Every structure is written in C-alpha cells, then in structure tokens.
Amino acid sequence: MIIIEDDNILYEEPRIGFVPVNSNKTIEVYIHPNDGGNVPHFHVRKYSASGKGFEWETCIRFDSADYFLHGKYKDKLPNRKVAKELDKMLRTINTTDIRKRTYWLLAIDDWNANNSSVTVDRTTEQPDYSQ
C-alpha cells in the first residue's frame, strides 16, 4: 500500500506491481481509491530519477485499451515499449499472491474493493494494451 496525504486526508493506494515485472521499480501500476469519473481504470506512473515526484502519470481503462484522462492525469505512456511491457506485466501471474492471480485480476479485485460506485466484472478480458 502507498500512503498519500491529500488535504490532510490519508489514502492507501493499492499497488498492483511494477513494469516490467521484477524491474528496478521505476514504473508503477496502482489503483486510486474512490477515484472520480465513474470509469473503472488503473494508474501508471514513472518515478523521477531524483525520487521526488513523477516524470509522467496516466490512467488506463479496464474495458478498452484507451486512456481515461481526468483531473491532473493528462499524460500518456511515453512509447510502445512501455505499452508492451505493461500488457505483458498484467498478463503475468503474481507469484507473491497467495491466490496466484494475474496482475490483471489483482487490479480488477483492487478496483472493486476500493471503488464502490462502479465495479468491473472479474471475467472481463484484458484488452491488448501493447499498442
């Protein structure tokens, strides 16, 4: 979990994982709790080299390989290599998960557990995010 302080309210952000899997942990996939817009999505961001802030941060829909740009999240993935690695990561089984879910299913479950207004069906197939 990541703890974010926003206007003196603490939020826990469920971390899905890093891109690529077993990487040096610079590109992170996570769920923002009680996220606005009523569009199920996950966040992807790259930490800056200095460790302070992010080089970019974007949101991607669960139901299609499209961005959900809203609020301060206006960036897009920087290149196709990152998109391919993201797609591959989400299709990979998380070996640290006791239930051995893919990162995709982990993301769906974390969205559903942390966003009550709209849920994602667990049988939703992962779109091709590699493009």
Please give the residue ranges for each predicted region.
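Metal-centered catalytic cores of metalloenzymes
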Residues: 1-131
